[in-house]
Design a protein with these regions (language model features):
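Short helix/turn-capping signatures at newly exposed starts of structured segments
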Residues: 19-130, 139-140, 158-182
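Bacterial Sec-dependent N-terminal signal peptides
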Residues: 1-26
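Short, solvent-exposed loop/beta-turn-alpha elements that line the ligand-binding surface or hinge
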Residues: 153-157
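Mixed-charge (Asp/Glu-Lys/Arg
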Residues: 135
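Positively charged
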Residues: 145-150
């Protein structure tokens, strides 16, 4: 009888722990961890109250404009870089992910490879830049940059070559992970 009671308690605890997932580092539709697409720049102090916020500002004729906001954990680990838009009520437009704990709902993050991206997400398009390849997803606001040095040598030079998903090696590492909110 005691065994059944202990078993029931342990099972209940396991179910409770399993259901209590931490979303502080999940990238979902209109959300990056604690940050929501609807948050304004003024909300940043509240959203990241337990973290360090560093604002990179520029002085203009009409006042001070925030160019970039860096978010650090209290221990000094760089989490995010936020770039606001220039609206009258500025919101976040671009987020650069620095911390590998941030992953998409399907588990793709900075420590993932191109194989992880193509296996877990639908690729919308691939844009070739001078030194990088940018991969946009259909099902997420996140996009990934892979350095051309990860590609075969015949694709590394020149930006006029359109690169397709089949040409990118499965083991290609992610250089940057970004989220774009327009």
């Amino acid at each position: 009888m005691i065994r059944k009671s202990i078993f029931a308690v342990v099972l209940s605890l396991l179910l409770f722990i399993q259901c209590n997932t931490n979303t502080d580092f999940v990238i979902a539709k209109d959300q990056v961890g604690k940050l929501m697409k609807s948050n304004t720049i003024d909300d940043i102090e509240t959203v990241f109250a337990s973290d360090s916020i560093v604002r990179d500002t520029a002085i203009t004729r009409i006042g001070t404009a925030v160019k970039k906001i860096n978010i650090y954990e209290k221990g000094g680990k760089h989490l995010l870089a936020l770039t606001p838009n220039m609206d009258s009520i500025p919101k976040i437009e671009i987020i650069r992910i620095y911390d590998p704990r941030y992953v998409t709902e399907k588990g793709v993050g900075l420590n993932s490879t191109f194989k992880d991206i193509k296996d877990k997400h639908s690729i919308k398009k691939i844009i070739t830049a001078l030194n990088n390849v940018v991969i946009f997803l259909k099902d997420s606001d996140a996009y990934f940059t892979i350095a051309k040095t990860e590609l075969p040598s015949n694709l590394q030079y020149g930006n006029n070559t359109d690169i397709e998903a089949v040409q990118i090696p499965d083991k290609a590492k992610i250089k940057y992970m970004m989220v774009g909110w327009e």
